[in-house]
Amino acid sequence: MSFLATKRQQAVGLVAAWVAATVEGADRLNPALLRALGRDESWDGWRLPLRGARGGDLHLLLDPEFPYSLPRFALGRRTDLLRAPHVETKGRLCLAGDGGRADTLDPVAVVAYSFGEALALIAEDEAGANREDYAIDFDAYWRRDVTDPLPLRTCLHAERRSRLVSAWHGQAFYFIAENARDARTWLTNRYGVDETRAFKNAALIWLDRLPEPEMYPDNAGRARRLIEASSYRGLPVFDRLMATMADRAAVVFMGATATGDVVQAGLLVEGPDWASTGTKAPKPNVSRGFRPGNAPPSILALRRRSHRVEVQRTDAWLGRMRAGEGAQLAGKRVAVLGCGSLGGGVAKLLLQSGVGRMTLIDPDTFAWVNVGRHELGSDSTERNKATALVERFRPMYPHARELRAEPTSWQVLLRRDPKALHDCDLILSLIGDWNAESALNDLQRSGTDEVRAAILYGWLEEQAGAAHALAIGPTGACLRCGFGPTGTIHVPATTWPRHAPVGCGGPTSIYGAVDLAPAQSLIASLAIDLLLGRASPPIRRAWLAPQPTLAQGGGCWHLRWIEHYGDPLQGGKLTATPWPKDAACSCALLPVTSFS
């Protein structure tokens, strides 16, 4: 027997002894009873009788991972509580929730405590003390009571108003967005172009008060009464949908929980069944008895069925971000110049963070040598990097409203279209080429209208021993202020007595994906701070790799860095350092124009 199996056997034995000594009338569950509760023979369980006039049982269940997991409890013979707060399918009680932690060295204490929590929950549910929890976890209770497996996938603004929105009716799911344009963009990004896609009206109803389960509608008439009682100005929107819909339409309920979280629930409304007299029988007319267009919405609703369905929010990832950040970034436009190992990863992080509009610019093709440290893989070799990244990112992040590739250099792009970067909120230059980036720096300071946004430069030192993120605006210190005339940085963080060989194509860069990840995070983090107004140029941040990374390649901290900013010692740290203006820099001689 394995170590973990032995630990489980010992823990189950201790719990069995505790049950026998503590709970009068308890019985061990046999395999048939375990299967009836949705468990198999790898589980252990007991029936614990509940005291009191209402009787019933509480099933104690231990899964195969016990004691390294929490005990579960389920109600038996208590149909009156099956729809009570914190009671899930088949009477399972929700106590600690996902991720609950236990003292894995004292299984009896864990079971005893959890048993007490289960009894307390039952007593509270019997007394009706937990009903406000229906609103706190509204979407979970709605999902528990769905009556149709077809989900609604939504991408909707959390606006506190009812309105007609747009729906695409697919076979596996319906997709709901604010309008047909947004719906088409999302679906095209995710699944590719399909000119046959058609869009229908759907209703988004803002509920001022979220319903409890007994008020969940099971037909369109009850849905209308719920809206009339709980939604300010939602009824005209619903009635309009009833008057204009054909066979089937989607309704999304939206409201705020007691904690302020915005939740959604779905409803499918459809006409009566087809008559069963044959395949050619006409469908019952929901407007019968009224002239066309004159049937009251209340009658139309009463004559239609509805099904509760699950809502799958395609923007649910925004809930894992700091409040409001995703919505702000959705309106930002950035350009990424250079889509190599650094630029590709930074672009991905920005899209994951919610940036809504992005242009990737790079003239080069993806080569086998970079397969181990790039967002692209072997299936993209010999393809243009910008184009391949856009094709990869679109289905991954369909929320991006605009994602374009320019398979050329930024210089060629601007010669073709001088305003190509005009509307950017931020330009990221991750080219790693002094000639190109000094030109970009001078263009920003030239007083022309081609580059109006701040520029965020990012680069690696040799063997990724350090990484730098430097934001430069139209005034103050410029890129040249910290470099010599041929692109040698004045204060490097590292020095490498043994340099990589230099061939006709330039020096070989020695680093892997793990070395690269902190640099990508460094640059993307500063980009987000700039876009959200939490930082302003000029600003420089640097990542200093762990000292063993340097030692492995024969590198060490540069004396000039130590003199200016202190000894990094063991490294592995992020630091913010000044980027002072150089009075002798040529930027002092260039005209500067501030664009509003």
PLM-predicted stretches and their roles:
Residues 322-365:
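Glycine-rich adenosine-cofactor-binding loop
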Residues 143-297, 422-426, 430-596:
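Glycine-rich phosphate/adenylate-binding loop
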Residues 363-399:
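Glycine-rich phosphate-binding loop and adjoining beta1-alpha1-beta2 segment
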Residues 34-99, 108-112:
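Compact alpha/beta protein-protein interaction domains typified by the UBC
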Residues 1-57:
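Strand-helix-loop interaction patch of compact alpha/beta domains
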Residues 273-334:
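N-terminal charged helix/coil linker that caps or initiates catalytic domains
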Residues 87-98, 103-144:
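Domain-level detector for trafficking modules
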Residues 389-425, 431-434:
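A structured beta-alpha segment of the ubiquitous adenosine-cofactor-binding alpha/beta core
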